[in-house]
A protein has these predicted regions:
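Phosphate-binding site of ATP-dependent enzymes
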Residues: 166, 192-245, 296-300, 306-316
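A long amphipathic alpha-helix within ATP-dependent nucleotide-binding catalytic cores
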Residues: 231, 244-311, 350-362
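ATP-dependent carboxylate/phosphate-activation module, predominantly the ATP-grasp catalytic core
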Residues: 222-277, 320-346
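C-terminal amphipathic "assembly/sorting" segment characterized by alternating charged
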Residues: 44-46, 50, 340-363
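Glycine-rich phosphate-binding loop of ATP-grasp-fold ATP-dependent ligases
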Residues: 148-149, 168-192, 219, 241-259
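ATP-grasp fold ATP-binding core
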Residues: 133, 162-183, 204-214, 293, ...
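N-terminal-proximal low-complexity accessory segments that begin disordered
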Residues: 1-44
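Conserved N-proximal alpha/beta basic substrate-recognition cap immediately N-terminal to
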Residues: 28-37, 49-157
Length: 363
């Protein structure tokens, strides 16, 4: 039996790297409100840790017909099923979630070792994404692939790179969606300089990359097992100011059609092939579980460059070494009644809600 738990505060926990980490209120609320999500991909007989089993059942029934095949359990019930657990599947692995699970009575032999968690944290640093981006561009040698990112360890070095870019984006090496990111227009002001200095002090450095005129967000989802990395499907998603808003729920062919005006299907095939191999080279034997690679279509800002569609593709904006909302969308898209709809996460001022809406409705 697999035990599932939704810990969306994972990205922030990685930045703190402290088993006693307490997430901010928003993270705790998101975890409580959407803790039923693993029911969408859990197998028959699996258990899911939730805050309120009755509420979880009600919410899960909105999205799946056979929710009774999985079992929602409270934290108090975990110790009762500990001997049945063969595998634990969180949203993402970090030292805090391991500590929480051990306190609930999960046997240590079904949890990753501290060394494995350290490796996962290292690979979750945005430096790894930048390294894979560089390798992918070198391997594919396509003129319409773009993207560069640099890791710097001081404010003077950061200012030098920003000066060469003009408009730039700086990112904390470990941070969650929409957080830990600042946009720079020509030069850093005092507030951003102070923020960047804190990031460098706490995390050892900071990422800096040029600002791109983004046209469309998309990504690729993968799963890693003992055999290696396997492609799971495309993700066409939507963000506002860098924060996730929602996903298109469609078949793989339909998502390819959405991207066709910007990215030729043959390019997608080559990207998938090369990226799968690169990820396999880096991750096999070091990580098992889901992951996602965020990408984007970029406007052609270089009129001298000839691109088949008139657009560029940034193939590795970041690598999320965890489950993503793209994986959630893939699970929902298997239900025919949700296809041609949009998956959306809303906050009403008190609670988070997962909805599916008609594509005609705006985010």
């Amino acid at each position: 039996m697999i035990l599932h738990i939704f810990n969306p505060e994972h990205d922030i926990a990685l930045s703190y790297d402290n088993k006693y980490f307490t997430p901010p209120h928003a993270g705790r609320q998101l975890r409580y409100d959407l803790d039923y999500l693993p029911a969408l991909w859990a197998k028959d007989g699996d258990c899911i840790i939730v805050g309120n089993t009755t509420s979880a059942m009600v919410h899960a029934r909105r999205f799946m017909a056979h929710v009774q095949r999985v079992r929602f359990i409270s934290q108090d019930e975990v110790a009762n099923v500990a001997d049945e657990i063969e595998l634990v599947s969180p949203w993402g692995w970090d030292s805090a979630i391991k500590f929480q699970l051990m306190k609930l009575g999960i046997h240590e032999d079904v949890l990753p070792s501290d060394a494995e968690l350290s490796e996962i944290r290292t690979l979750s640093n945005r430096r790894f994404s930048a390294h894979v981006l560089q390798q992918l561009q070198q391997d594919m040698q396509l003129p319409f692939l773009c993207g560069e990112a640099f890791y710097v360890e001081s404010i003077p070095a950061l200012k030098d790179v920003i000066q060469s870019f003009g408009k730039a984006i700086i990112k904390a090496p470990w941070s969650s969606s929409g957080r830990g990111v600042r946009y720079i227009d020509q030069a850093m002001d005092a507030a951003i300089t102070s923020w960047a200095a804190r990031v460098i002090s706490q995390q050892g450095g900071i990422m800096v990359e040029p600002y791109y005129n983004k046209i469309k967000d998309f990504g690729m989802e993968f799963f890693v097992d003992v055999a290696g990395v396997h492609y799971a499907g495309l993700s066409v998603f939507h963000t506002i100011n860098g924060a996730y808003v929602g996903n298109s729920l469609s078949t793989e062919d339909e998502k390819r059609q959405m991207l066709a005006p910007y990215v030729d299907n043959r390019v997608l095939d080559r990207l998938t092939e090369h990226l799968t191999q690169l990820l396999n080279d880096h991750l096999k034997g070091k990580y098992q579980g889901p992951l996602g690679v965020d990408m984007m279509v970029v406007a052609n800002q270089n009129t001298a460059a000839d691109t088949p569609s008139g657009f560029f593709v940034h193939p590795v904006v970041e690598i999320n070494l965890r489950r993503t909302m793209g994986h959630v969308a893939l699970s929902l898209s298997k239900e025919e009644r949700f296809q041609q709809r949009m998956m959306r996460v809303d906050y009403d001022g008190a609670h988070y809600h997962l909805h599916t809406i008609h594509k005609e409705q705006r985010f």
